[in-house]
Amino acid sequence: MQLSDFNYELPPELIAQHPLANRTDSRLLEVRADGMNHAHLVDRQFKDILILAQPGDLLVFNDTKVIPARLHGKKETGGNVELLIERISGEKQAWVQIRASKVPKTGSTVHIYNQSGETFSVEMIGYDGRFYEVLFPDHVFSLLERFGKLPLPPYIEHQPDGEDAQRYQTVVAKNPGAVAAPTAGLHFDEVILQKLKDVGVNQATVTLHVGAGTFTPVREEDLSKHQMHYEWFSIPKETLQAIEKTKKNGGRIIAVGTTSLRALESQANSQQSSGETNLFITPGYQFKVVDCLLTNFHLPKSTLLMLVSAFAGVDNIRSAYQHAINQQYRFFSYGDAMFLCRLENIKP
């Protein structure tokens, strides 16, 4: 398939700029495929996850935590520069995206500052053709806490505020390292998590630190030429055991978000419970672990739109997205959600 197969026109007013008052207030579009692989679309509220997830199923969340990954500074020449952490590669090292009129050269220094007037300097030490490696003078995390800003997605037009600091994190977030939130998890609050437990829906976690590359557009019309970005993941032994037990007992594995799905499928492919993954899922991929997927609506021509198309069928996703546009669903990180099941895993 070609990149143009995953394009669609989205009215800009449907891009959610702020979260709703309550996490569980969002809408939920259920996409059911029949034996002819046609999509049956059911408009629901997110709280209907209590119906869609059934006793014996296993919800798998990504427990990564968004870090204040955006830094502002000046080059040695005095020009402004913005650094966005892509992924942390060591105690004092990170790969970054750089925005500047002219990118600083390897070996040069960038001076980072904050609103309190404090400064520190990072050294440019490498370039891999896409991202720049920088060396920090101290622990990356501690410096980000003092100097960094929350990295909202590029389509959110306001500067991050106190509301974003709370709502652009999931309630299960505990392992710092992500540059973007695993947005399907944003719809859950503590109350609905407990209600799911009460009705016999089990829960487990993985960690996948979402990188800034998740927002990088695919530029190759031939998808086989696209270079997928790397992200670090880890799956606890307890989660692997819960998956095995669930499948043995006839339950379904429900990935909460594409990042949870990619972590689970990466482990199944590599048989490694942690490491870096650049798994690029397109139509034709044979899913090994995940039966159902809870996910938000994704950007045109994005790798995530390709993933959900692989999962539920290209035509089904096209129909679902057009329906969502017609029905004024809210799109992207702060938007509404979809519930998808693979054809052979639909329960009546």
Curated annotation (Swiss-Prot):
Its EC number is 2.4.99.17. It holds the Pfam family Queuosine_synth. It catalyses: 7-aminomethyl-7-carbaguanosine(34) in tRNA + S-adenosyl-L-methionine = epoxyqueuosine(34) in tRNA + adenine + L-methionine + 2 H(+). It is found in: Cytoplasm. One of its GO terms (molecular function) is S-adenosylmethionine:tRNA ribosyltransferase-isomerase activity. It is an enzyme of class 2 (transferase). One of its GO terms (cellular component) is cytoplasm. Its main location: cytoplasm. Pathway: tRNA modification; tRNA-queuosine biosynthesis. GO terms for biological process: queuosine biosynthetic process; tRNA wobble guanine modification. It comes from the Bacteria. Belongs to the QueA family. Monomer. Transfers and isomerizes the ribose moiety from AdoMet to the 7-aminomethyl group of 7-deazaguanine (preQ1-tRNA) to give epoxyqueuosine (oQ-tRNA). PANTHER family: S-ADENOSYLMETHIONINE:TRNA RIBOSYLTRANSFERASE-ISOMERASE. This is S-adenosylmethionine:tRNA ribosyltransferase-isomerase. It comes from Polynucleobacter asymbioticus (strain DSM 18221 / CIP 109841 / QLW-P1DMWA-1) (Polynucleobacter necessarius subsp. asymbioticus).
